[in-house]
Amino acid sequence: MFRARGFSETGMRDIADAAGLSPANLYHYFRGKDEILFYCQDRALDRMLAGISSARRLNGPVPARLHQVLSSHLQVMLDEVEGATAHLQTDALPPALRDRIVRKRDRYEHGLRALVAAGVARGECVAPDPALAARAMLGALNWTVTWFNPAGPRSASEIGEAVAAFLVRGVAARSTNIKPTRLTLVRRKSRTTGARHV
């Protein structure tokens, strides 16, 4: 509902109807739509942080681990339940909930920055400013939700693999041997049209 109508235009009754619940049942779990938005963002960030932790425990080349993190990030962002534009609407949350999300988001950004810095230290990445590189990656990944079409010809997984490959090649050292990701972009029948969506 947040994807289709936007947070401000979506009411609890709309969400209940879409979920096949009565408003009373929905209110049993959430006191308002801001709690639903918080749940979506908090759960998404937990998945992203788990991806960072997993990648940092591995011993393989940093570009390969970075690819794993970025691809996973985008699949979370494009998830029908936890992702979409809901992840970008932090300002819609009450201050107490927003602060919790911002702290967790900052932890994730710091983890991504540390991974890029590790690649630089090992000579596998070229990024004079790892913080800037990490933020540029996050900007590209997060903006994808504004043009991705779930009914389009490419799945979230395919988009995630392709975008991650582009971004990793932007920081990978020329001497680093990165095995290209083979993508089989299966064309699916689109229920909508529009050149700006994929």
Cite the ranges covered by each PLM segment:
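Short helix-capping/turn signature of helix-turn-helix
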Residues: 30, 88-93
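Amphipathic alpha-helical packing segments from all-alpha helical-bundle domains
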Residues: 43-49, 79, 96-121, 131-135
